[in-house]
Amino acid sequence: MLWQTFFSSLLLLSLLFGCNGDESLPEVTDSEEAPMDKREREALYSAIQGFVGDSWNGSALYPDPCGWTPIQGVSCDIYNDLWYVTDLSLGLIYENSLPCSSSLQIRPELFELKHLRSLSFFNCFISPMVIAKEELWTNFASNLESLEFRSNPGLIGELPETIGNLTKLKSLVVLENGFSGELPASICNLKRLKRLVFAGNSFAGMIPNCFKGLKELLILDLSRNSFSGTLPTSFGDLVSLLKLDLSNNLLEGNLPQELGFLKNLTLLDLRNNRFSGGLSKNIENIQSLTELVLSNNPMGEEDMVGTNWGKMSNLVVLDLSKMGLRGEIPTSLTNLKRLRFLGLNNNNLTGFVPSKKLEALPCLGALYINGNNLTGELRFSTKFYEKMGRRFKASKNPNLCQPLEMVMSESHKHLSPLGVKPCT
């Protein structure tokens, strides 16, 4: 009993004074010890209420938004022993996110969140409205690193020139909204950008030729707009770029030689534009490419043999359909051992199909050569047809045929390519 009392006393002393004789235990930091800045909390409530509706009572529902009553879409961090909002996402991004009201307001209190690093709006702006006053956005210039507007058809008008004042931005995503007009050249002031997306809007006019300083940019997506004119030569200075998507615009002219300087590029998608003048010889120098999509551009009577496709050994997707290409299918294509998709359809290709060499490509899972002037006999094996299924098309080649036994065989005729006549 005496020993039990002795050890209990030792335990009590260790709790009171610590192992090293300290007179107090370490402090625990929580929302009680680090309260939220009062003005910050009120600004947050008012800003969210403007988007959600006046019936939303933030102080009653979420009395401690950075602590024990967190708001979905709100993240906080501590500055000078006080909690401040650092991330704010509005709209039904997640199942339990706060939905935006059809009569929302962008209140000035939003721009009082001075430590905000990330701000995103998803499916919030449905009714037509112009983005908030230009001068308010400069309040975010010191800290904002990510700004996203996704699926907001009611966001109309031009992108404000003051967007270029947000020089800390690393990610600017303006995806599937109602913006129109020309891109402000001030976006090229955003030297820290790694991702720049303006896809799915109604932007028009020429792309500003001012990208020289964006050395850190990894992703540039301007697809699904109405941009016109030629490609800026300053694209060649985007030395870190991994993905360039300019598809579905009204761009025209020759492909600039400067594209060949993009040595880290993995995706180049220029489909559905008006480019002409043939394939740029420098494209074959982008040996990092895994996806090259140039389909539906009137490139003219370009001979495919003039390009050494074998140099682009990392290609997985190659789509050159509807380009007016002529000549034979180059044998250098058969060196692309990683190729899974090859689209050569609806061109003016002639000559024989290198069946055995194409079949030898180990990863090939889709081959489209329909709509050309190819001749001779298809010499693919039944195993190839079984593998490809309907992902192989060779129809609309008037002088192309398939072996008679392929058509006559009851066990194989279901594999024979549609629209290819039997050889006689």
UniProtKB/Swiss-Prot annotation:
Top-rank lineage group of the source organism: Eukaryota
Biological-process GO terms, alphabetical: biological process involved in symbiotic interaction; response to symbiotic fungus
Secretion signal span: 1-21
Membrane topology: Peripheral membrane protein
Family matches, as Gene3D superfamilies: Ribonuclease Inhibitor (3.80.10.10)
Subcellular location as annotated: Cell membrane
Gene Ontology terms: cellular component: plasma membrane
Key words of the record: Cell membrane, Leucine-rich repeat, Membrane, Repeat, Signal
Role, per record: Required for growth promotion and enhanced seed production mediated by the endophytic fungus Piriformospora indica.
Miscellaneous remark of the record: Loss-of-function mutants do not show any induction of At5g16590, another leucine-rich repeat protein located in plasma membrane microdomains.
Protein name, entry field: Piriformospora indica-insensitive protein 2
Native source organism of the sequence: Arabidopsis thaliana
